[in-house]
Amino acid sequence: MNKKNTIFLNSLYMDFLTENELDLFLKSLDEIWTAELYTNLKQNGLIRHVISKVWNKGQHRITQVFEYESQDSFKKCESILKDAFTPKNCPALAKFVFKIFNNRGIVVSEYKSD
């Protein structure tokens, strides 16, 4: 693997108590993930952010995948997100109850179809 092409990832699961809470969270995405926040993250090395709703029966979960240019970019963006998502700075997020599971890593193998 070429270290120059290494992509740092953060895969995050968010489990909600009910489907209704999860759906309300999804309707609030524009309040939580603002254009200003994305601009700041992009300037600090965020390449991509994906939010997916998990449709496994009996789960009320979303996943988020963050791709970063480098480990340094990850650290900068982690600090930005920590500050952005305080109850004071993001009251829209503060109203939800959920559990977060984080998995951080680097891409070691990837397939892309042409």
Positions of predicted regions on the chain:
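Glycine-rich beta-strand-turn "strand-cap" elements at beta-sheet edges
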Residues: M1-T6, N44-T63, T86-D114
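Short glycine-rich, basic-tinged beta-strand/loop micro-motifs
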Residues: S11, Q59-R61, S70
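Short amphipathic alpha-helices within nucleic acid-binding modules
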Residues: L22-L24, E69-K82
